Structure formats: C-alpha cells, structure tokens
Amino acid sequence: MELLSALSLGELALSFSRVPLFPVFDLSYFIVSILYLKYEPGAVELSRRHPVASWLCAMLHCFGSYILADLLLGEPLIDYFSNNSSILLASAVWYLIFFCPLDLFYKCVCFLPVKLIFVAMKEVVRVRKIAVGIHHAHHHYHHGWFIMIATGWVKGSGVALLSNVEQLLRGVWKPETNEILHMSFPTKASLYGAILFTLQQTRWLPVSKASLIFIFTMFMVSCKVFLTATHSHSSPFDVLEAYVCPVLFGTGSGGDHPQDNHGAWPGGPPSGALATKSKEELSEGSRKKKTKKAD
C-alpha cells in the first residue's frame, strides 16, 4: 500500500473502480462476444435459417456468466434478463453484426485498431465481474472460500465454460472442445484472478479492492490486446506452468506410462502381434509334422 501511495495510484485506482460500465464498456463486451460467435463455423448460416437460435446463442455469449453464477448460488437463472436495457443493447449488436447491409458494421468492428480497443474494454468488464461475483458470494457464504472462487471464476469465464451448451443450440456437439479440459488464457486468468480477489475479500491480501481491480485489469488488458494483435493462442502462463506442473503433478503425459499396452513390457511388441506370431509358429510346426508323416 505504501508503494501504491508513493506512485499516487490510490486515487487513480479508486476513480477507475467507480467508472460505470453501462453503456460504453458493456457495448464493447457485447461486440467482442458476438464477434467470436460469428467466427464459429456455420454461425452465419444458422442466423439465416434459424434466427431465434442464433439470437439465443448470442445472448448466451453475452450473459452466460450471469446464468452460470446464478445457478451456483441457487438464484433464478433468468434473473439478469429482467435488465431490459442490456438485453436490447445486446440484441441490437447481434442484429448489426449478422444482418447489417454489406456487413458494414462487422467490417468496422473487425478493423484491427478498433477491435483492440473493444478487446481492452471487454477485459475491464471481465475483471469487474469477477470482483462483483466474489463480493456477491461472500455475502451469502462468509467463509466459503471455494464458493467465492468458483463464483468469481464463472463470472469471468462463464461463456467459455458453457461453450458445449452453446454448441448444442447451434446443432453442434464437440465434447473434445470442453473448456475445462483445454483452458484458454481468459479462463485461466479468471481462475487466478478469482483466487486473488477471494484472498483480498477475506483480508488475506493486504491491498484495497480498488487497487487490485486496477492492477489486474492492466494485466488482463495488456495480455489480451497483445495476444489479439499478434493472433496468438498461447498463454502467458505457459512458461510458469511448464516448470510448476511437472513438480506438483508429474509430467501428465499418457505416453510415459510403462504399461500402456495393458501389461505389455515397454518397448516390446503389442499383445496382438504376440498372439499372431504364436499362431504362425503353431501352424508352421503342424505343417512340418504333416510333411514328415508324408515322407
């Protein structure tokens, strides 16, 4: 805290945490979320043939984190849909991205410098949602650390965690794309951020919430803008995980097990090959015996 005061970041962080998200930041969040929906294979054809299904997918991209958080806390799943302003704004963005003449709106928001601004503003919303989700969970479960972490995590990455449900709405089933099995950078960052905000909420992290929001937002904005600008799908956590995971969890490689062939010795032929070889040897022995009898 002394360092933050010396750098005069305390007042800046407090002012930043009080900036309202609606409508500018929420608009950016909706634009980027529905852009990612349009990138999905078959999304454009779905919007032409089944516009209601396409709209539902867009709403899930925009509000999936709220739905999943309400599910965890036992609250009505459609509670957030009572916010008419947000629903209408997200619906307008969906219509412009998919149905604007000549794709003018889509081309404008996809222009890289403009898109980077929207991506940065979306990360501001993501971090604020994590902080609000943990505060909400703390109100119900004062000592439920894991509940607070889970709620903050889904508030930050609920859309990705519900990707399989969204795929079903589009008539696609890809269980191998489960986000928990293959976490993207935003999902991992939301989890780590949820842990940090939980420690701050329970007073184990000696920093104000406004300062933590500001610092973590700057980290998320910098990383996501860089990854988007370079069209990279890697994660800044990969280097750290490459050192930590083998120590804590082992190599995690399925090919390192010595008995992957159900009991066969490593380096030896598979059991099917051994069985085939044995049959060939028996057949050869029988043939030799018959030859001797004939002689």
Swiss-Prot record:
Catalytic activity entry: K(+)(in) = K(+)(out)
Annotated positions binding Ca(2+): 74
A Pfam family reported for this protein in Swiss-Prot or TrEMBL: TRIC
Keyword terms, alphabetized: Calcium, Ion channel, Ion transport, Membrane, Metal-binding, Nucleus, Potassium, Potassium channel, Potassium transport, Sarcoplasmic reticulum, Transmembrane, Transmembrane helix, Transport
Region (Disordered): 256-295
Keyword Oxidoreductase among UniProt keywords: no
Keyword Calcium included in the entry's annotation: yes
Location in the cell: Sarcoplasmic reticulum membrane; Nucleus membrane
Sequence ranges on the Cytoplasmic membrane side: 40-51, 107-144, 200-209, 256-295
Lumenal side: 1-18, 73-85, 166-178, 231-234
Membrane topology: Multi-pass membrane protein
Residues binding a 1,2-diacyl-sn-glycero-3-phospho-(1D-myo-inositol-4,5-bisphosphate), per UniProt: 122, 126
Gene Ontology biological process terms from the UniProt entry: regulation of release of sequestered calcium ion into cytosol
Any one GO cellular component localisation term in the record: sarcoplasmic reticulum membrane
Start-end of Basic and acidic residues biased regions: 277-286
Transmembrane segments: 19-39, 52-72, 86-106, 145-165, 179-199, 210-230, 235-255
GO molecular function: identical protein binding; metal ion binding; potassium channel activity
Activity regulation details: Channel activity is activated by a change of voltage within the sarcoplasmic reticulum lumen and blocked by luminal high Ca(2+) levels.
Family as reported in the entry's similarity comment: Belongs to the TMEM38 family.
Subunit (UniProt): Homotrimer; conformation seems to be controled by binding to diacylglycerol (DAG).
Physiological role: Intracellular monovalent cation channel required for maintenance of rapid intracellular calcium release. Acts as a potassium counter-ion channel that functions in synchronization with calcium release from intracellular stores. Opened by a change of voltage within the sarcoplasmic reticulum lumen.
PANTHER family, per the entry: TRIMERIC INTRACELLULAR CATION CHANNEL (PTHR12454), TRIMERIC INTRACELLULAR CATION CHANNEL TYPE A (PTHR12454:SF3)
Annotated protein name in UniProt: Trimeric intracellular cation channel type A
Organism: Oryctolagus cuniculus (Rabbit)
